[in-house]
A protein has these predicted regions:
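N-terminal leader/targeting segments and the immediate start of mature chains
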Residues: 2-69, 78-79, 116-118, 128-129, ...
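Short, solvent-exposed recognition patches
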Residues: 202-289, 300-303, 307
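An acidic-aromatic
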Residues: 52, 56-110, 164-181, 185-186, ...
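Intrinsically disordered, low-complexity linker/loop segments enriched in Gly/Pro
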Residues: 104-151
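Hydrophobic/aromatic beta-strand elements that line small-molecule binding cavities or substrate pockets
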Residues: 59-63, 127, 151-155, 178-181, ...
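Short, hydrophobic/aromatic-rich segments at coil-to-beta transitions
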Residues: 40-46, 67-72, 133-140, 161-164, ...
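Short, solvent-exposed coil/turn segments at beta-strand boundaries
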Residues: 38-40, 62-71, 84-89, 134, ...
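Gly/Pro-enriched, hydrophobic low-complexity segments
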Residues: 132-198, 272-275
């Protein structure tokens, strides 16, 4: 499918982005508020997600209290799709392939350190507008290098929750749009839809034996500002093979490195694919006694993902010495 060619100017945003900032206020403070709201805010809303000319609409219910967080997503058009998460862990879905997992680290919303973020992004506040009838502040986040994309964030003035985001490449092509059409912070609204439907399949999480030998492969190169935020070990349905995943983030952008063992006659090949902002780069890796597939998936430019994947060969060479 052809890439969406819409540029920021045709979205009516050119004047906003090209004009000087309306405020000298540090955009980093708004990003810190946004990160805090992701962890603490309860709400119910309906939003539109767009990438590469394709649209999906979803409802979300999210409740955060002293016992943790619960979140349910429901696709409202097309095939029924549903996801339920407790404390960030997927516990129910209509398309589950997971069989079991062991998590050496706890997944959580990224902590945004505005000073560290300023090393790799420039952040500017560009005034106010409205999203879903609510006043929001617009923060433009521009990368200082070519290893990540630009963001335009519309942050709710009252709660700090992000109500709209645009992801833009270095040619100012729109890669992704996320936008709430309606949102409520009233308890009866967000509590009403937290129970899964009858077709939502439980994701069975059982412990992989602690004695199981699990090796995580670290890339020899990471883009500046990225660091490891989470590790996990999984097996897929009808397979006992262990698949490791490692999530890296710079506070805004993130990518995941998957390592999957292969058998000798596996048809898996090197590949590069992209859908909107999401890129996937796979490399077959061979050691003296094993064969596996390393895949980098994330919302980073293709050249970034390729360099990360290529650096794994250096990691393996150093380990073999």
């Amino acid at each position: 499918m052809p890439r969406l060619k819409t540029v920021l100017g045709s979205l009516g945003l050119a004047a906003l982005l090209l004009a000087p900032p309306l405020s000298a206020e540090d955009g980093g403070r708004w990003l810190e508020r946004m990160a805090q709201a992701v962890k603490e805010q309860s709400y119910h809303g309906s939003y539109v997600y767009e990438r590469t000319g394709m649209f999906t609409t979803q409802d979300i219910w999210r409740q955060v209290d002293t016992s943790g967080s619960r979140e349910r997503l429901l696709q409202t058009a097309g095939r029924h799709q549903e996801w339920l998460r407790h404390d960030g862990r997927l516990v129910c879905t209509t398309s589950s392939d997971l069989k079991r997992s062991r998590s050496p680290g706890r997944s959580s919303a990224p902590l945004i350190d505005s000073q560290q973020l300023a090393d790799v992004y420039s952040m500017k506040v560009y005034g106010e507008t409205r999203i879903a009838t609510r006043p929001v502040t617009v923060v433009a986040v521009q990368p200082r290098d070519g290893f990540r994309y630009a963001h335009e964030l519309y942050i709710d003035n009252e709660t700090g929750l992000m109500l709209k985001s645009l992801l833009v490449d270095d040619k100012r092509e729109l890669l992704e749009r996320f936008q709430f059409a309606a949102i409520s912070f009233d308890a009866p609204d967000y509590q009403a839809g937290l129970e899964p439907s009858s077709v939502c399949q439980e994701v069975i999480i059982t412990d992989i034996p602690a004695a199981t030998d699990v090796s995580f492969l670290e890339p020899a190169w990471l883009p500046p500002g990225f660091s490891l935020s989470h590790r996990d070990v999984q097996t897929m349905r009808d397979s006992e093979a262990l698949i490791t995943s490692q999530v890296y983030s710079d506070g805004l952008a993130s990518f995941t490195l998957f390592i999957e063992p292969l058998v000798g006659d596996s048809l898996a090949e090197d590949l590069r694919a992209q859908l909107g902002p999401t890129v996937a780069v796979s490399r077959r890796m061979v050691t003296a006694d094993s064969l596996f597939l390393a895949t980098v998936v994330g919302e980073v430019p293709p050249r970034t993902a390729e360099r990360i994947a290529e650096s794994l060969e250096q990691t393996m060479a150093e380990a073999a010495r």
